[in-house]
Regions:
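Generic beta-strand/beta-sheet core signal
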Residues: 99, 126, 148, 174, ...
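Short helix/loop capping segments that flank catalytic or ligand/cofactor-binding pockets
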Residues: 106-108, 133-134, 156, 181-182, ...
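Conserved, well-structured core domains of diverse proteins
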Residues: 1-59, 560, 568, 579-581, ...
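Short, glycine-/Ser/Thr-/acidic-enriched flexible segments
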Residues: 31, 39, 69, 103-105, ...
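Charged (often Lys/Glu-rich) extended helix/loop segments that serve as interaction or gating elements
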Residues: 314, 320-641
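Low-complexity, highly charged intrinsically disordered N-terminal segments
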Residues: 27-104
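Active-site-proximal beta-alpha core segment in soluble small-molecule metabolic enzymes
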Residues: 89-284, 291, 305-310, 318, ...
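Short glycine/threonine-rich loop-to-helix capping motif typified by GTGT followed
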Residues: 253-261, 292-310, 340-354
């Protein structure tokens, strides 16, 4: 019964039923399990996968990638729109594309293209490099390749070549200069690719990316620029080549009302252009389908106040309503949502290496007549504190502490005395917080004290590499321990990474009602790794991660699960080693080895080191090129000499 209650408490604390979208749950053993097909009928314990990694000496941190979640999420996306089209008897069609920038990892795109083929799923690119990579994939014959972003001549020439390859290319115009080059190039080669116009809507998105939309957006054509573009296309005799109207009101749209406003406006733009004799076929609604990171289903920036089906229903209904009122045939709807497709399929796993203790053991502190009077007074405060005087006595302890530290700074107090003071102050704070909790009164001073005293869990990863959005824009990701969920978590803590940067600390966590300043965690056991999972990290994080402190891309396991819930296949992808990271920064292996060799040679000539030691160090140095930059599971000191 206790285990069951602890599991129920864990479900409530970590909110997995809210943000898991059917892909994650907690087993009766108190472990996190994955449901790759979106239901509980098929499940695999994440600890089993980590056992596989341990047996093969695959170090944490690592990403667990589940292509079947990607496949399921793609099916959900297309089903939502198809269901809406059936319900409203929509006469147009659907074409979804994946924005390359959301996750450019080859392993991910490989799985995406394979899963997307049955949906005629396409790709969206925004740069020459992305287009170059995307063209190497053979997509479904009906799949679109939408080319956004600012373009130079080489970008445009490559797009024209793609049309010769049989690709359904649409070049979306960001400015009239781009359009003029396309028109000129089309004259030279004797054909034109499909053209799209990106509209700068008045309607805005919501959430963290609201500023990327509206009339102040850096992207899209104003109404005046739109009219100029239409005139240029008509003058060039390319009216039949204008195929798409495109807009985008930002990533992670949190409010469905904003979606509706934009849909109405964009549908009007589409209809007006169509009625002017242009051969429009596609209305590209951009991306922005929100991911409910905190499980609250609200308009909070880490959530979304609508479901995928509601989003699709509103889009289809409003496009049809506007087109009917304009006597315009309904277009093929194009969706570029990538976050909602990619986020769920990847889990970052790492292990806790250390928990920082606050203070020491009060039982080990001995205060006698030989100690400074302030130390004796402080111990007296600790011993005499009660529920009636805890506020006053706590204030006294702070005053004593400040006086003692001032004396230390002036050289009148020993380091041992300072250490005793720290232990006593720590225990006084604990005692005061205990009485404050019993009082039922909420004093701001003690609420802040409680926040400041959360434990610090040192985890073996880099925030800047693996979840950079949590640092750069304070994006929230679900975080929870992967085991021991049938035990009560006795501590609250923040998570520190192993970079030498004070910003490498995670102190904001998801909660259905608010944002938590700490996370419920267990005391790690010395003989068992304590693994923590960071969920919904499959969108943008790998693309935006940086090599701060020379921590690079982490190890990966690509996991396939059988319909019976067995581990069917696990593919290993090695993370970046030290040598690869240094080469990115323009170091060469030869240059580094030469630097070591020259210094060791000088030491050898000076008689400070033996040839055997030189040889041993050089052998050690060569091995470092293939070293994983993160902390090893068990480190063994190698003795030189």
């Amino acid at each position: 019964m206790a285990n069951t209650q602890n599991i129920q408490d864990a479900l409530q604390k970590y909110g997995i039923d809210g943000w898991g979208a059917g892909y994650f749950g907690v087993s009766s053993r108190g472990t996190v399990e994955v449901h790759p097909f979106g239901n509980e009928e098929v499940s695999v314990d994440l600890s089993r996968i980590l056992e596989h990694a341990s047996e093969r000496r695959i170090q944490t941190p690592l990403i667990l990638r589940f292509p079947q979640i990607l496949d399921t999420q793609l099916a959900r996306l297309h089903s939502a729109f198809r269901n809406a089209m059936d319900e409203f008897k929509y006469a147009g069609d659907l074409r979804c594309v994946f924005p390359y920038k959301v996750n450019q990892r080859k392993e991910y795109i490989d799985a995406l293209v394979k899963s997307g083929r049955k949906h005629a799923y396409g790709l969206e690119v925004g740069t020459k490099a992305e287009l170059f990579a995307a063209l190497s994939y053979e997509l479904h014959p009906d799949a679109l390749m939408v080319c956004n972003g600012f373009k130079d001549s080489r970008y445009i020439e490559l797009a024209f070549s793609a049309k010769k390859m049989g690709k359904n290319i649409v070049l979306v115009i960001e400015g009239t200069d781009e359009l003029k080059f396309i028109i000129e190039y089309a004259k030279q080669v004797g054909f034109c690719v499909d053209i799209g116009l990106r509209a700068k809507l008045y309607s805005k998105g919501s959430g963290l990316w609201e500023k990327s939309s509206g009339t102040e957006s850096k992207f899209g054509l104003s109404s005046v620029e739109m009219m100029e573009a239409l005139w240029l296309i008509e003058e060039a005799g390319l009216k039949s080549s204008l195929a798409m109207v495109h807009y985008h009101i930002g990533s992670q749209i949190t409010e469905i009302k904003r979606v509706k406003n934009a849909m109405k406006e964009a549908s009007r733009v589409y209809s007006k252009i169509y009625k002017n004799g242009f051969n429009l076929r596609y209305l590209n609604i951009g991306g922005g389908i929100g991911v409910d990171y905190d499980g609250s289903k609200t308009s909070f920036y880490a959530s979304a106040n609508y479901t995928l089906q509601e989003f699709a229903n509103d889009v289809v209904y409003l496009v049809q309503e506007v087109c009917q009122s304009e006597n315009c045939p309904p277009p093929t709807i194009v969706s570029e949502s990538g976050r909602a497709v990619a986020a769920y399929h990847a889990v970052l796993v790492t292990d806790v290496r250390e928990v920082e203790k606050m203070g020491g053991d009060i039982q080990e502190v001995i205060i006698d007549e030989g100690d400074h009077k302030l130390l004796r007074d402080m111990m007296n405060v600790y011993q005499q504190m009660s529920s009636k005087n805890y506020v006053e006595f706590y204030h006294d302890s702070i005053e004593y502490r400040d006086e003692l530290f001032t004396l230390f700074g002036l050289g009148y107090l020993s380091l041992e005395a300072r250490a005793k003071a720290e232990v006593i102050v720590n225990e006084i704070a604990n005692k005061a917080l205990h009485y404050h909790a019993l009082s039922g009164v909420q004093l701001e001073e003690f609420e802040e004290l409680a926040k400041s005293r959360t434990s610090k869990y040192l985890a073996n990863f880099s925030i800047f590499q693996s979840i950079p959005d949590s640092w750069s824009i304070e994006q929230l990701f679900p975080v929870m321990p992967l085991t021991r969920l049938n035990e009560r978590a006795s501590k609250t803590g923040v998570i520190m990474d192993i970079t030498c940067d004070s910003d490498g600390c995670l102190d904001k966590f998801v909660d259905k009602r608010d944002v938590k300043n700490s996370l419920e965690l267990h005391v790690p056991q010395s003989d068992t790794p304590y693994h923590i999972g960071f969920f919904l990290v499959g969108a943008y994080q790998e693309a935006l991660g940086n090599n701060h402190n020379l921590f690079g891309a982490v190890n990966e396991l690509i996991v396939q699960v059988s319909p019976q819930g067995q581990l069917e296949n696990i593919e290993e992808v090695k993370g970046e080693d030290v040598g690869e990271l240094l080469r990115v920064m323009n170091y060469t292996d030869e240059g580094i080895l030469s630097g070591f060799a020259q210094q060791l040679s000088a030491r050898l000539k000076a008689g400070k080191i033996t040839q055997a030691e030189v040889d041993q160090i050089m052998q050690q140095v060569k091995g470092y090129f293939s070293e994983y930059p993160y902390l090893l599971v068990k480190s063994r000191l190698e003795i030189i000499g």
